[in-house]
């Protein structure tokens, strides 16, 4: 949204704060001449694709085990501020391009994608504040009225938990709800029942994973799906028609020497594809993320041929919110959806460009958090603004996850009768 009257950026600041894992991250603040301002906090991933934009860390072992972000903070105040202060906050592309040009690298390793993204998002928030409208309305205009179906990560494995489950996330999606408020209640009720089931069977040895899901001691990935079905039914819901399943396999994490190592064995790509097809035939799985290694393009073609017409196949490590990687996927006919993580690409403008590219080629988009999160709720507004119809922001506990859900509840209330829950208009996961 542009205004004829410019909103001149007067001052940019940044500071080192903590994320949900107790690790440092960056918070950026953009203040306009009018006094309006925006603050944004940048998330961080545990399972990261090798093609992601560069997250700048200090590398000083005496501070935060080398994970400090004081370099990124200094880059905001010393290198970004001089090229952005004086620009119009309403011209998001100009602000982002100024930072990209100042960085001068393909992956933002000079300034750090975390430094650039903080300023990019804070600029949009300041612009929205200048107009005294919500961020979702500023970014999406009058059509920003679609509430996303949540992918609720209730069982954690892989890199997100210390247990013997290979797949990284097992999720529930309340596709049959009438409203987002109802969907959230359904998810919370299933999550509560799931906890009881796991405790009764003495399958819990600790608390929850990075994203708020349980990290139980299970014998296989299939056991996780069985327990989810049981929890859904015990909570009084119908698996599939009311609450569907989704998985983030994060296959790059257990790909070694051309083989996929899971369930205690080593398997060929075709065997792994067949295994996933078997799971889809046995369970109401509507979405699979990162089902194969991020560079195993030939196998991705096979997976898409096998499951692409019946299941949403999401590229995360495969595409890393990058329009170049997405375009390659489109050209090769690989996957049919993309996970959108702001810090994988590093600016709001490039994120919106990637979503637009996906939409033009009938690829679905899923707005996503990271495993290291903050109380920042930008992705909730972004999901509504872009009408993508899906959001992935963790489980039904841990306040950095719940903050996004609560923001969506407030947005739904603000929209009133104009609010539409995505599955009601066919904007949930693509599946048959």
From Swiss-Prot:
Biased amino acid composition, Basic and acidic residues: 52-64
Can you cite an annotated GO cellular component?
phosphopyruvate hydratase complex
Superkingdom of origin organism? Bacteria
Q: What is its EC number?
A: 4.2.1.11
What chemistry does it catalyse, as a reaction equation?
(2R)-2-phosphoglycerate = phosphoenolpyruvate + H2O
Pfam families cross-referenced by the UniProt entry: Enolase_C (PF00113), Enolase_N (PF03952)
Query: GO molecular function: any one?
Result: phosphopyruvate hydratase activity
Q: Which Gene3D superfamilies match?
A: Enolase-like C-terminal domain (3.20.20.120), Enolase-like, N-terminal domain (3.30.390.10)
Q: Which biological process terms from the Gene Ontology are attached to this UniProt entry?
A: glycolytic process
Q: Which PANTHER family match?
A: ENOLASE
The name of this protein is: Enolase
What organism is the protein native to? Synechocystis sp. (strain ATCC 27184 / PCC 6803 / Kazusa)
């Amino acid at each position: 949204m542009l205004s004829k009257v410019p909103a001149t950026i007067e001052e940019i600041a940044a500071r080192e704060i903590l994320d949900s894992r107790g690790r440092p991250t960056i918070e950026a603040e953009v203040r306009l001449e009018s006094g309006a301002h925006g603050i944004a906090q940048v998330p961080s991933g545990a399972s990261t694709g090798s093609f992601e934009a560069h997250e700048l860390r200090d590398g000083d072992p005496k501070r935060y085990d080398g994970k400090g972000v004081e370099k990124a903070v200094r880059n905001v105040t010393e290198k970004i501020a001089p090229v952005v202060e004086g620009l119009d906050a309403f011209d998001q592309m100009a602000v982002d391009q100024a930072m990209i040009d100042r960085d001068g690298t393909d992956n933002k390793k000079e300034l750090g994608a975390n430094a650039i993204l903080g300023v990019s998002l804070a600029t949009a928030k300041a612009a929205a504040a200048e107009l005294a409208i919500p961020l979702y309305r500023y970014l999406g205009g009058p059509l920003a009225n679609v509430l996303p179906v949540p992918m609720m990560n209730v069982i954690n494995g892989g890199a997100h938990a210390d247990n013997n489950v290979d797949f990284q996330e097992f999720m529930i999606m309340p596709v049959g709800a009438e409203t987002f408020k109802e969907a959230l209640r359904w998810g919370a009720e299933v999550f509560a029942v799931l906890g009881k089931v796991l405790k009764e069977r003495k399958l819990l040895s600790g608390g929850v994973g990075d994203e708020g899901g349980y990290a139980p001691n299970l014998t296989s990935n299939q056991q996780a799906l069985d327990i989810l079905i049981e929890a859904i039914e015990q909570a009084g819901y119908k698996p599939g028609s009311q609450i569907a399943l989704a998985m983030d396999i994060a296959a790059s994490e257990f790909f070694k020497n051309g083989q996929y190592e899971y369930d205690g064995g080593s398997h060929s790509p075709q065997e792994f594809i067949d295994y996933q097809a078997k799971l889809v035939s046995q369970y109401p799985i509507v979405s699979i993320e990162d089902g194969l290694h991020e560079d195993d393009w030939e196998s991705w073609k096979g997976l898409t041929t096998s499951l692409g017409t019946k299941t949403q196949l999401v590229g995360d490590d495969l595409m890393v919110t990058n329009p170049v990687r997405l375009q390659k996927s489109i050209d090769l006919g690989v996957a049919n959806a993309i996970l959108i993580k702001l810090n994988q690409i590093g600016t709001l403008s490039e994120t919106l460009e990637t979503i637009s590219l996906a939409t033009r080629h009938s690829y679905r988009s899923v707005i996503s958090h990271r495993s290291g999160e903050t109380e920042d709720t930008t992705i909730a507004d972004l999901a509504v603004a872009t009408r993508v119809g899906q959001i992935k922001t963790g489980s039904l506990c841990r306040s950095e996850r719940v903050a996004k859900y609560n923001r969506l509840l407030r947005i739904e209330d603000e929209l009133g009768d104009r609010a539409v829950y995505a599955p009601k208009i066919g904007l949930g996961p693509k599946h048959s």
